[in-house]
Amino acid sequence: MKKIDRQEVYDFLTRIPKGKVVTYGMIGEYLGNVHFARMVGNILHENTDGEKYPCYKVVSASGKLSENYAFGGIEKQKELLEKDGIKVACNKVDLKKYKW
């Protein structure tokens, strides 16, 4: 299986506009295969600079927030998304409205 370039994942995060989210699969697809979603998740969990590489903007394919968000858990991810103007209900975002 192709190896994913960690920096390419992090660079992708910096291009997500304020008020928008992406899914793990969208990043995987950008890297060449939607099935890379799990590897993308592992890379994001190892992110050491949440301000420089805003992984809070990544949600599941159903719009669900990450219970294991690396920088403070699901409540912190929710707070950051709401600060960007993204409405969160029941720990999910409306992908029809907010997907980049």
Task: Indicate residue ranges for each PLM-predicted region.
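Nucleic acid-binding interface residues in structured DNA/RNA-binding domains
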Residues: 1-100
